[in-house]
């Protein structure tokens, strides 16, 4: 009986992690890919126009802390001239944003 309970707990935890990962990918595809690309390279028409960073580049990833990425997603991002280039993700929870940051980290090569 104990083995069945442990198995059920592990299975539930694994399912929750899988759901979180797929939610992050879905959020990326819906909210981020238009500029940053499905592959994170930022080479979409909009991404090139706005100067989106290449998240597959290890040096770009190293220069961006999780905290800075979280803040940019939560509050939006302005360029050096003060022009909004990324709107805040108002409909995402903090957990959703953390998931997006973690998903963005998977692009690093």
Question: How does the language model describe each region?
Answer:
Residues 1-4:
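Positively charged n-region of N-terminal signal peptides that target proteins for export
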Residues 12-27, 43:
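Electrostatic cytochrome c docking/interface patches
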Residues 21-33, 64, 94:
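Sequence context surrounding c-type heme c attachment/ligation sites in exported
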Residues 28-38, 100, 104:
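The canonical Cys-X-X-Cys-His
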Residues 39-41, 59:
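Short, well-ordered turn and helix-capping elements at secondary-structure junctions
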Residues 46-54, 58-59, 72-107:
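Axial heme c-ligation environment in periplasmic c-type cytochrome domains
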């Amino acid at each position: 009986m104990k083995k069945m309970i442990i198995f059920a707990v592990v299975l539930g935890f694994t399912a929750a992690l899988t759901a979180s990962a797929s939610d992050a990918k879905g959020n990326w595809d819906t909210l981020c890919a238009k500029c940053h690309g499905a592959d994170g390279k930022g080479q979409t028409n909009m991404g090139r126009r706005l100067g989106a960073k290449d998240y597959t580049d290890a040096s770009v990833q190293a220069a961006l802390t999780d905290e800075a990425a979280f803040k940019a997603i939560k509050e939006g991002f302005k360029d050096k001239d003060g022009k909004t280039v990324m709107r805040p993700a108002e409909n995402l929870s903090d957990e959703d944003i953390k998931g997006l940051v973690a998903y963005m980290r998977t692009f690093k090569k």
